[in-house]
Each structure stands twice: as C-alpha cells, then as structure tokens.
C-alpha cells in the first residue's frame, strides 16, 4: 500500500502547485489590467481637462428641439413601440374629454400612407388668443411642453395623458401634422412641419359639429426602423380603453385594407359594464371559479371610483 500512498501524495502536491500557479497568473493578469485601466482613465482625464468646458458647452434647446434630439425620453423608444405610442398620446386627449363628460365618440383611422387621423366629438381645443404666449391656445397646446388644460382643476378632474406633454411631442416627432378644431360653430385649423407652425391658426369655415381632428405622419428620420402601424396593436389598446372607460364608443378604421364588400377594415369598441365586462373578456372560454364578477363603483370628491 505504501507505493500507492506516496504516488497519491505526490499527485496531490502537484495539484496544489498547479492551483497556486493559476492563482499567481490570475493575480498578475488583474494587476496588469488595473494598471492599464488607470493609465487609460488618467489619459482621458487629461484630455477632458484640456477641453474648454465653459458656458459655450451648455446647450439650451428651444421649443421642440429637445424632443426631436432625445425622443426616447418622451415616448420610450423610436421603434415599433414608440411609433404606436404617438397614437396613444393623441387618443388620451380625447379620453380626457370623455372623462370630463364632454365626449362620447372617438375615431382612429390608419390612412393609406400610414399617417394617423384621430377625431372626437369633445369641446374642441380652445383657439382664442393665449394672453401670456401671444398666440392661439391651439398653437400653444401643439408646440409647448407642459401646455394643456389638465393643470386647471376646473377643466379636468381626472386625466389619462402626460398632462400636456403628449400631443406636443407627437407634433415634434411628426413630419407633418394638421389640427382641425370644430368649436362654437366655427372651423379652425393649423398645420405644422416637424413641430413648427406653417401658418397662424386660421378660421376656414362654419359648422354645427364640435370636436378636434388631428392627422399626423411620423418623421422617417426619427422612426428609422418602421413607419407601418400594426392594426392588432392599436385594436388591443383601443379595446382596453373602451373597457376602462365604459360608455365611450371607439371606432378603428384601416384604410390600407378593404373587405369583400368594399368597406374598409375596422371595428367598433364599446362597453356598458366597463371593467366587469373586461374581466369576462379576459376569461374567454375558460370556466370561471366565481360565476358572477364582483364589482363595485361609486364617486369620491366628484371623481368616479
């Protein structure tokens, strides 16, 4: 047994030496990497110190320039998700009108060129002169970050958008946008290119309608991955909004495709029971453990709960 014992001991010692040798190599490698990193950082620090970091280095972007330069800060990204988010922001303004009790119908149209048109029968964005800005309130809403009626507790008790950020961001990120307002028997409009007004808000006619129409075409220099809207993505979102805001009727129309009868593809979303009906929709064909959905609703401080 002794020869085997000495052989085993010999092998064990060699293994220990091997482990020790590997640890030494790893330690030396880490030291070299640390020295290289320290040298690199010192070089960069010297380069930075040589740069003229002064007042001229500070950029003050005007208007919507910051939105166009950093769009992901406002809409999440510039891919498919961000592209569809533009629609959500405009629709949210119509939803706010509905929550305030002034809108019953919302229509979203995917046009043949993949531009989007949204229309509601709300009160219409105000078009009279804004005292502080010196331009029409419509132009303020469309071109100023943080502009909107949702900060005024007398105008909106609840809201679902980005509180004035949304529609101006959509305008900034659009190659072209046209806003048409039906308000107090008159039709007003203004068009924009990349967020900048092409002309002052002007009266273009008379009407017995009311509401706001916004048509926008996303800027291809910003949305470089795709400009094509997905019908199912928009349908899913609008369906959820109809459930979350019972009583509202939301129409989705896709002018890129026609059915056999010649009508455009589309569907209408409307819910009488709201979230209660939404739960049934989510259950689908599955057998529920609780036959009847338990739901409560009321009002607190004038806000539906």
Region roles according to the model:
Residues 81-103, 166-171:
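Conserved ATP-binding N-box helix of the HATPase_c
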Residues 42-57, 114-137, 148-281:
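GHKL-type ATPase core
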Residues 1-26, 37-38:
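Positively charged N-terminal leader segments that act as targeting/secretion signals
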Residues 66-69, 73, 96, 100, ...:
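Conserved helix-loop functional segments at active or binding sites
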Residues 104-109:
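A conserved short beta-strand within the histidine kinase catalytic ATPase domain
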Residues 281-305:
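Noncatalytic partner-interaction/assembly domains of nucleic-acid and motor enzyme complexes
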Residues 37-91, 139-140:
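Bergerat-fold GHKL ATPase/HATPase_c domain
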